[in-house]
């Protein structure tokens, strides 16, 4: 009887945690806000839209390169949420295909976002979709702590 109560309590907590996790939402960042925040954080931001002109579902692209360390953070604004979900899914699959024997990964999702983090083969990869925007990061693991501060400041 005691084991059943403990098991029920555990299942109840997991269920509540799962349900509340799905109701969490994030505020999306606009292209202008991304440029401003990244510039203030010592990044050089360039408009990368010309590299994606043939993709009509991509509205805006900004590439932010850290002035001192040289790693890059990419920000995409897509036509709508469905395109962003597809873009996220395709890039997540690419990240997953790069897994080596030793890796760590984390996934989370909420009402309007999905996030995937993978560390493998000395690379740190982060993909976050919030509504119709996607933050894409594929850098050397040595910059992990620095880029996590950037991600946190963006709210992604």
Regions found by a protein language model. Name each.
Residues 36-54, 84-131, 151-156:
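Short Gly/Thr-rich strand-loop-strand
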Residues 66-88, 137:
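A short acidic-to-branched-hydrophobic micro-motif
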Residues 1-5:
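Positively charged n-region of N-terminal signal peptides that target proteins for export
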């Amino acid at each position: 009887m005691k084991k059943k109560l403990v098991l029920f309590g555990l299942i109840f907590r997991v269920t509540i945690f799962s349900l509340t996790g799905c109701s969490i939402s994030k505020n999306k960042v606009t292209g202008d806000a991304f440029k401003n925040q990244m510039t203030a954080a010592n990044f050089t931001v360039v408009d990368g839209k010309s590299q994606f002109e043939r993709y009509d579902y991509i509205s805006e692209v900004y590439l932010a390169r850290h002035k001192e360390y040289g790693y890059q953070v990419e920000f995409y604004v897509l036509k709508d949420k469905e395109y962003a979900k597809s873009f996220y899914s395709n890039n997540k699959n690419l990240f997953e295909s790069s897994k080596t024997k030793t890796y760590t990964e984390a996934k989370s999702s909420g009402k309007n976002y999905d996030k995937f983090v993978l560390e493998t083969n000395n690379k740190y990869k982060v993909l976050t979709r919030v509504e119709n925007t996607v933050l894409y990061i594929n850098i050397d693991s040595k910059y992990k702590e620095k880029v996590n501060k950037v991600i946190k400041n963006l709210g992604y």
